[in-house]
Amino acid sequence: MLTRSTLVTNSALALLGLAMVVLCRQGVNEIHHFVIGFGWVAMLQALLYLVAVWVVLNRPVDRWTFVIIVVCAIACRLVCLFSPPFLSSDIFRYVWDGQVQAAGINPFRYIPADAHLAFLRDLEIYPHINRRDYAHTIYPPGSQMLFLLITRIGATVRWMKAGMVGLEALTIWIMVKLLQALGLRREQVLIYAWHPLVLWEVASSGHVDGAALPFIALALLFYVRHKPVATGVALAAATLIKLYPIALFPALYRRSAWRDWRMPAVVAGIVAAGYASYSSVGPHVLGFLPEYAKEEGLDSGSRYFLLTFARHGLHWDALPTSAFYVFSALLLLGLAVWAFLNSEAGDMTAIRCGFVIATVLMLLFSSHYPWYYLWLLPFLSLIPYVPMLYFTTACFYLYTTQLANPGPAMYYMFEWLYGTTALVALSCMARKAFALHPRNS
């Protein structure tokens, strides 16, 4: 029933949604015609998004609220979909890998510049492939299967983006089902559907991380519905597309079912079968991953902000990289045990455990690429934790600034990002403590 309160809510969201669409269009236009710069577009969109989140969490809603949310989400995606990718060139490798497979060649066998693949070179895809002169593909088997499937429909960037956006958009529908199953308002899907990270890193850049999101959401939904085999299938699919979702396993394996090996067997079997499909290249089925670890400083420790901060900010110059690895491993192991022991404490508790594991993993990893944080967004729709809402939104904006350049600038970016997130977390804790123990007047 439409009331004055819900009319205010819907009017506010309609205006905010329209502004989000306009800013998507302006961001696309900034590629060719500088007006205010993409960084300003990103900042404005991030601020409007946070206002929209506040509205949907604190204002009354009706059936039209959900319609407005979905329509605006679709409109934003369509604006970004039909524009060329400009924040990343990864999608050109996706199309290339699909074409290589269509030619009957294992995509892990040759680098794009290899003479064996000269017959596949063209002017639309090949010149734009990053690391084409020295890097094998890094994308896991699940991603490779998607690349092959989509390029059989159309071997173009637009078709690849359409495939990724189509899969990502399924996440909205799945999240609505999950919200309803948990007794939460379906309008909270706005937290996911309107997030600028999704709009620009999936709808605009077409990152394959977006294709993992519906399977992560499905794993959560099947867990809530007490379907362990289906949970395992969805988790395995997400893992084969992007490796990190496997970290959710301890939270999604019910302690009461520890004698039931179906779920872990399904996960292990599907992941093994996926890699076996490309095993004709032997250990090279890992692709560029080992070299990538060196290139990104994963082996030396230069990649990890918390380690760098300990060495330079806290002046623990002699702290070895191995100590950070041990600390990270023990912390994640402890969280895994905690999640497993709490798997029978309720569906929301298990989801919260998974969210904590995913968050801690990403904070330890301190990715140099914003799309790696995409998998946190489905959790935020279920658990709107303010510090991580701030973190993911600020992350989106800061990566559009000059602070995102590798080197000292990026260190200062992380120092600002982690520091302000810590302040937001402390303020939330203080507010909660004050609410529980108000001062006597």
Residue ranges: model-predicted function:
Residues 1-79, 180, 346, 350-352, ...:
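Start-transfer (signal-anchor) and selected internal transmembrane alpha helices
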Residues 48-58, 149, 156-182, 186, ...:
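Transmembrane-helix motifs of polytopic, lipid-linked glycan transferases
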Residues 63-68, 175-197:
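Transmembrane-helix signature of polytopic, membrane-embedded enzymes
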Residues 69-76, 257-280:
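Hydrophobic alpha-helical membrane-interfacial segments at the cytosolic entry of transmembrane helices
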Residues 172, 271-275, 293-367:
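Aromatic/glycine/proline-enriched transmembrane-helix motif characteristic
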Residues 385-441:
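Aromatic-enriched
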